[in-house]
Amino acid sequence: MSIEKQVAEQLLEIKAVFLKPNEPFTWASGIKSPIYCDNRLTLGFPKVRQFIAKSLAEKIKENFGEVDVVAGTATAGIPHAAWVSDLLDLPMVYVRSKAKEHGKGNQIEGPLTKGQKVVVIEDLISTGGSSLKAVEALEEAGAEVLGIAAIFTYGLDKGKKLLEESNTKLVTLTNYDELIEVALNKNYVTTEDMATLKEWKKNPEVWGK
């Protein structure tokens, strides 16, 4: 079984991903969605989080072999970045969404030297906006960002466009299309639900309005 399918299956099993085509969730961005992904739940399942860390480490070795530092995004990316940096025997930093308003006022915590090559660890990619803020902060600090490694992506056109425009490479363990196929095969959703799930991805901003 592929990594994509294995991770999708695990996320469904531990209920890190909820699929409710008939009772959509509302994201913080206001988008109505038949899916909600909370990868923080992986923290409570040692076998799942270990598999995710090992798989992310392998992806990084394959795609970003020159990496010097692993950077987690606050807060959900931090634990995964810690486990991955351990496996790769690399330093780790983490990046806040904005600089602290007290203390040293740091946006990046941990030692980072100009010119170091960094890979950003994310738990989830939706529109890509928050991930790119982390990339920008690292670049402003003088780092060279090789790319982003994430557990899951919705694969939305808006996110793809933002990443392409910023010339940021993204590698993920699994994705929306793979996950809904696994969900159908494992009877988490019906064939009718699948039509709704596929329709949402075509135009999430207007779906459900």
Swiss-Prot record:
Species of provenance: Listeria innocua serovar 6a (strain ATCC BAA-680 / CLIP 11262)
E.C. numbers: 2.4.2.10
Binding site residues for 5-phospho-alpha-D-ribose 1-diphosphate: 96, 100, 102, 122-130
Gene it is expressed from: pyrE
Keyword Magnesium in record: yes
Reactions that this protein is recorded to catalyse: orotidine 5'-phosphate + diphosphate = orotate + 5-phospho-alpha-D-ribose 1-diphosphate
Name of the protein in question: Orotate phosphoribosyltransferase
Keywords in alphabetical order: Glycosyltransferase, Magnesium, Pyrimidine biosynthesis, Transferase
Necessary cofactors: Mg(2+)
